[in-house]
């Protein structure tokens, strides 16, 4: 986390994009897919917004895919947003578009499961390289925003897991957010000690 915030104090609101049809079908929907939100996903976001789940933000960033941009426009209509080029979902490779049921019996999938998700996806990305890429994008955001800002980040589940596990030192799968849900991450301290407090959104 060297120099992540240059001793700045900020609050980051991480929100996973709303549901797509593939999400509801429990399929791997990654970098290769630019699927937009389904009606059920849109309606769920609107309901959560009306219930006051999403706090106001000073700055807004979102992933490049339609599902992230549509989510940003539903939750924060009219708010300017920036799209960091790094913020994409992981490349699931041969698992893209397939469900757990469809992958049962696939030896490559079994090996990946047994590794705890640490093996690279066949013909896709490794978790290690993906985390590095996501942290590069997060560093840019952290440098860009002024101190004491509340920063919205609407992204993919993988992006959220990568960043929060890297800055907290906890496990990658400790930060699995449901669609439309997420985490509030407060980062504060000085050049000697960086503190990170993460709570579930809502």
Question: What annotation goes with each model-predicted range?
Answer:
Residues 12, 149-157:
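Generic beta-sheet signal
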Residues 9-11, 15-79:
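Active-site-proximal alpha-helix that buttresses catalytic centers in soluble enzyme cores
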Residues 168-195:
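Domain-level recognition of soluble alpha/beta enzyme cores
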Residues 52-56, 141-149:
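Glycine-rich phosphate-binding loop signature in dinucleotide/nucleotide-binding domains
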Residues 62-63, 132, 154-155:
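Short beta-strand scaffold positions
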Residues 35-36, 75-133:
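Phosphate-handling substructures
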Residues 17, 79-86, 171-180:
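Short hydrophobic/aromatic-enriched beta-strand-loop microsegments
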Residues 20, 159-160:
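Short active-site segment of divalent metal-dependent hydrolases/proteases
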């Amino acid at each position: 986390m060297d120099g992540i915030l240059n001793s700045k104090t900020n609050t980051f609101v991480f929100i996973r994009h709303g549901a797509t049809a593939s999400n509801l079908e429990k399929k791997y929907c990654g970098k290769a897919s630019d699927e937009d939100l389904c009606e059920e996903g849109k309606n769920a976001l609107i309901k959560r917004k009306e219930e006051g789940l999403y706090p106001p933000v000073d700055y807004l960033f979102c992933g490049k895919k339609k599902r992230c941009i549509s989510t940003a426009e539903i939750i924060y209509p009219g708010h300017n947003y920036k799209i960091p080029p790094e913020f994409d979902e992981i490349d699931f490779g041969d698992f893209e578009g397939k469900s757990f049921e469809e992958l049962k019996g696939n030896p490559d999938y079994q090996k990946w499961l047994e590794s705890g998700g640490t093996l690279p996806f066949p013909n896709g990305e490794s978790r290690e390289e993906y985390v590095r890429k996501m942290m590069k994008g997060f560093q840019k955001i952290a440098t860009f925003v002024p101190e004491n800002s509340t920063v919205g980040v609407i992204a993919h589940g993988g992006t959220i897991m990568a960043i929060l596990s890297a800055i907290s030192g906890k496990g990658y799968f400790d930060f699995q957010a449901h669609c439309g849900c997420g985490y509030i991450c407060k980062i504060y301290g000085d050049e000697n000690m960086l503190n990170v407090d993460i709570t579930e959104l809502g």
